C-alpha cells in the first residue's frame, strides 16, 4: 500500500490551507502531486502540491487519474466521507 497514490485522502500540513483535507488526483513527479478538496467541500483548490506538505491518512477513494472535481465530489459522497472531509485538523508546531 503506497502512501502517495491517486485517490488517497491527505491533510495539508503547510501553507494557508494547513489542516484541511484533500484528495490526490494525479502524481506529477517524485516531488509533486495534483490535489483537490474539492473547494466547496474542504476549501482546498485544485493545485500542485509538494508531497512534503501532505500527511496521508488511511482513507482512500476509488477515482481515476486526473478525475474532475465533480467526479471526486460524487465519490466522496458515495463513500460517506463528506463530514470527514469538512473537518479541519489543528496543526501542532513543534517548539524547541
Curated annotation (Swiss-Prot):
Q: Which SUPFAM superfamilies match?
A: Translation proteins SH3-like domain
Name the CDD domains for this protein: eL14
User: What is the protein named?
Assistant: Large ribosomal subunit protein eL14
Q: Which GO terms describe its biological process?
A: ribosomal large subunit biogenesis; translation
Concerning its family, UniProt says: Belongs to the eukaryotic ribosomal protein eL14 family.
HAMAP family membership: Ribosomal_eL14
Q: Name one GO molecular function term.
A: RNA binding
Alphabetically ordered keywords of this record? Ribonucleoprotein, Ribosomal protein
Amino acid at each position: 500500500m503506497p502512501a502517495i497514490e491517486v485517490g488517497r485522502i491527505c491533510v495539508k500540513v503547510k501553507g494557508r490551507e494547513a489542516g484541511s483535507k484533500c484528495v490526490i488526483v494525479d502524481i506529477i513527479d517524485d516531488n509533486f502531486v495534483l490535489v483537490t478538496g474539492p473547494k466547496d467541500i474542504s476549501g482546498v483548490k485544485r493545485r500542485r502540491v509538494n508531497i512534503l506538505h501532505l500527511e496521508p491518512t488511511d482513507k482512500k477513494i476509488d477515482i481515476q487519474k486526473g478525475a474532475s472535481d465533480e467526479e471526486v465530489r460524487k465519490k466522496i459522497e458515495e463513500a460517506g466521507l463528506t463530514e470527514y472531509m469538512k473537518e479541519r485538523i489543528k496543526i501542532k508546531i513543534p517548539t524547541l
